From Swiss-Prot:
Known role: Involved in teeth and skeletal development. Has an essential role in the biosynthesis and trafficking of glycosaminoglycans and glycoproteins to produce a proper functioning extracellular matrix. Required for extracellular matrix mineralization. Also involved in the regulation of cellular calcium homeostasis. Does not show transport activity towards bile acids or steroid sulfates (including taurocholate, cholate, chenodeoxycholate, estrone-3-sulfate, dehydroepiandrosterone sulfate (DHEAS) and pregnenolone sulfate).
Gene Ontology molecular function terms on file: bile acid transmembrane transporter activity; symporter activity
A Pfam family it matches: SBF_like
Protein name, entry field: Sodium/bile acid cotransporter 7
Any one cellular-component term (Gene Ontology): Golgi membrane
Sequence similarity: Belongs to the bile acid:sodium symporter (BASS) (TC 2.A.28) family.
Keywords: Cell membrane, Endoplasmic reticulum, Golgi apparatus, Ion transport, Membrane, Sodium, Sodium transport, Symport, Transmembrane, Transmembrane helix, Transport
Top-rank taxon: Eukaryota
GO biological process terms held by the UniProt record: bone development; heparin proteoglycan biosynthetic process; intracellular calcium ion homeostasis; sodium ion transport
InterPro entries: Na+/solute_symporter_sf (IPR038770), Put_Na-Bile_cotransptr (IPR016833)
Main location as per UniProt: membrane
Gene this protein is translated from: Slc10a7
Length: 340
């Protein structure tokens, strides 16, 4: 009985285990072109649902105030698209003297050059109770920015260049991010009183969508023949990726919690996730365009295929810890405020 109660309370963590297990048993169900059609249901419907859900749940004034938080936007975008790839490049200079496959290392560099994802950072920020409005803006803005910046970074660090279909990617992002968010805000204006009275489970909806994303991502990972590497290389790359993620999460936490940073605990949560997450849905198509016909494309893609599920899993596992820190920090701020 107590076990069932615990499982109900931790339903999301149980859901992650079930999703990964189901993906391992029958990955063909959730791969692109499979029965679930994730190229439509995830890339379009799931992402649109997340941002429509956010549009419904967020107060308009919260979105407006997030737009003018320039310091936060600059921090996230500079960290993601400048510091991250540069730091990875320096790290790879050390790893280049090891026996690790050079194309896997180049794949790690491509991870550093990728834009942030449009969904996972938003969902995790919402799950913690952080600054969701800031996460939405930076995920969307970073994705749009990455369409232009990422090919330039790949050219700079790897010497690879190709024409990217900016128009089609821009239109997909606009239709799945901007339009649902605006529609959600418009609908909210008409049912605001009902929303505040009933308090629908927006967090549960977002978390359920994330479970679907986790499931289809692992279906792709388990069914991908390109990940047929020796176990040592896979374990080593996985260890490096998790170490990089944890190090950068810690780094963003340290920078954003300094006394003179000007960031609230809720801002810090958005910064941690938005600064360290990288997009698979934008990343893989970009790699296929930029490295079209390259004989080592499969190896170059492996680190990103591992990084994406790893960031979702790591973020999901850390949600209770980060939430506990944020709540205690917010209580501390309230207690130290002078009473009038």
């Amino acid at each position: 009985m107590r076990l069932l109660e615990r499982a109900r309370k931790e339903w999301f963590m149980v859901g992650i285990v079930v999703a990964i297990g189901a993906a391992k048993l029958e990955p063909s169900v959730g791969v692109n072109g499979g029965p679930l059609k994730p190229e439509i249901t995830v890339s379009y419907i799931a992402v649109a649902t997340i941002f429509f859900n956010s549009g419904l749940s967020l107060k308009t004034e919260e979105l407006t105030s997030a737009l003018v938080h320039l310091r936060l936007h600059l921090f996230i975008q500079i960290f993601t698209l400048a510091f991250f790839p540069a730091a990875i490049w320096l790290f790879l200079q050390l790893l280049s003297v090891t026996s690790i496959n050079e194309w896997l290392l180049k794949g790690l560099q491509t991870v550093g050059c990728m834009p942030p994802p449009v969904s996972s950072a938003v969902i995790l920020t919402k799950a913690v109770g952080g600054n969701e409005a800031a996460a939405i803006f930076n995920s969307a803005f970073g994705s749009f920015l990455g369409i232009v910046v990422t090919p330039v970074l790949l050219l700079l660090f790897l010497g690879s260049s190709s024409s990217v279909p900016f128009t089609s990617i821009f239109s997909q992002l606009f239709m799945t991010v901007v339009v649902p968010l605006v529609i959600g805000q418009i609908v909210r204006r008409y049912i605001k009183d009902w929303l505040e009275r009933k308090k629908p489970p927006f967090g549960v909806v977002s978390s359920s969508v994330l479970l679907m994303i986790i499931y289809t991502t692992f279906c792709d990972t388990f069914s991908n023949p390109n990940i047929d590497l020796d176990k040592f290389s896979l374990i080593l790359i996985l260890f490096i990726i998790v170490s990089v993620q944890l190090s950068f999460m810690l780094l963003t936490f340290i920078f954003s919690t300094r006394n003179n940073s000007g960031f609230t605990p809720a801002d810090t949560v958005a910064i941690i996730f938005c600064s360290t997450h990288k997009s698979l849905t934008l990343g893989i198509p970009m790699l296929k365009i930029v490295f079209a016909g390259h004989e080592h494309l499969s190896l170059i893609s492996v680190p990103l295929l591992i990084y994406h599920p790893a960031q979702i899993l790591l973020g999901s596992v850390l949600v209770p810890t980060i939430k506990s820190w944020m709540v205690s920090r917010q209580k501390g701020v309230k207690l130290t405020r002078p009473t009038v």
